[in-house]
A protein has these predicted regions:
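Bacterial N-terminal signal peptides that target proteins for export
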Residues: 1-11
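Bacterial N-terminal signal peptides
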Residues: 9-21
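N-terminal signal peptide c-region/cleavage motif recognized by signal peptidases
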Residues: 21-27
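N-terminal maturation segment of proteins
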Residues: 28-370
Length: 370
């Protein structure tokens, strides 16, 4: 229940798993000495088997990841979003790296196994950085918020092929309220300590949260997305002959109760907090580097985490200003060349609105665009 996209750790692990499936290494293809080649292959096979074990262990931390992969273990649960769970998972990652380094010889691996080693170790290092700055990352936000992710996840990934699957869905709705409570308490604490979203992010969260609990059974409007999904999945069981029509109606009644008992209060508590704290949010903050505790350190860490550059934030900012200045110079040169009089903003509006700068909305225009 972390994000509206594939959980970060899972995405990295899938990339890691793909590396395990990579073609044979250069040493294997080039006809290296048989004994040496066999030793490399043996060590690489041992490591890859170990990776398979650890990946299976890692998935146990995330019922959501298991479901995304099409598996039904822990199907009635959501991820534990408590601080204690995060500490346990980070400790597990650290222990796996220590075990890997003590049990295997990096220099005795083939090229692909070394890449897998590097990726596994990098996953731990990235997780450690994220954990170090976990308070700086917004608990709810308009881009990757749990308030939009969980309904999307349940609708798109929680398949119902039996009554047990349907009951697991309802259990997840109950777990949603508990998870929201944990996250909301963290968001409150963070905001009080200066880790607060900008106003537009609050507004985005509010819009998304309100949308989830708009419509039946929450109000008199058309069916909400979750309610429509639950009804369709109950009817699907009846259509498949798994249950009869009467049982499907019973399941729908249970689903309606779960939405009102768990989802409605969870979202309304989030909405109430966001509405109340909105007045404290800055309209257009300068950025986390200057508005958050340890913001400058967090910004530098995120630069290293998301890019391959060693430049510091000040250098990158300077490059940005220089690039804006360069582009403006080039645009002014174009304005002068075409004889346009007015400001740069006027020129942008002129280009955007004058039909002569647009391809016609025809097959010929589309072909010309291509």
């Amino acid at each position: 229940m972390h994000r509206p996209h594939l959980p970060h750790a899972l995405a990295l692990s899938i990339a890691f798993a793909l590396a395990l499936a990579a073609p044979a290494s250069h040493a294997e293809r080039s006809g290296a000495a048989p004994a040496a080649q066999e030793a490399v292959q043996d060590e690489s096979r041992r490591l890859n088997a170990w990776f398979d074990e650890k990946f299976a262990e890692e998935l146990r931390f995330s019922p959501i990841a298991l479901t995304v992969l099409g598996r039904k273990e822990l199907y009635d649960q959501l991820d534990d979003v408590s601080d204690e769970a995060a500490e346990r998972q980070l400790a597990w990652r650290r222990a796996t790296v220590e075990e890997m380094e003590s049990r295997f010889d990096y220099d005795a691996l083939d090229e692909e196994a070394r890449l897998s080693w590097d990726l596994w170790k990098q996953q731990y290092e990235l997780a450690a950085v994220r954990h170090r700055f976990r308070r700086n990352a917004y608990v709810f936000n308009q881009m990757q918020g749990v308030q939009s992710f969980l309904p999307t996840f349940l609708i798109n990934f929680h398949k119902v092929e039996s009554e047990a699957d349907f009951q697991a869905y309802l259990s997840r709705l109950a777990a949603l309220r508990k998870g929201f409570g944990t996250l909301l308490e963290r968001a409150r604490r963070n905001a009080e300590d200066g880790y607060r979203m900008p106003r537009f992010a609050y507004e985005g969260v509010l819009a998304e949260a309100r949308a989830v609990v708009s419509g039946a059974p929450f109000d008199e409007g058309p069916d909400s997305a979750l309610w429509a999904d639950l009804q369709a999945k109950a009817d699907g069981l009846a259509k498949a002959g798994t249950i009869d029509a009467a049982r499907a109606e019973t399941l729908k009644s249970q689903a309606r109760e779960a939405l009102l008992a768990h989802v409605a209060p969870a979202y309304r508590e989030l909405i109430a907090w966001a509405e109340a704290d909105l007045v404290n949010a800055q309209e257009n903050p300068a950025g986390v580097g200057s508005t958050q505790p340890e913001g400058a350190e967090y910004y530098r860490a995120m630069l290293r985490l998301h890019t391959s550059t060693d430049l510091d934030p000040a250098q990158i900012h300077r490059i940005g200003l220089e690039e804006v200045e360069r582009i403006h110079r080039e645009m002014h040169a174009v304005m002068e060349r075409v004889g346009f009089e007015g400001s740069l903003q006027d020129f942008f509006a002129y280009i955007a609105s004058d039909p002569k700068f647009r391809f016609p909305d025809t097959d010929e225009g589309r072909q010309a665009y291509i």
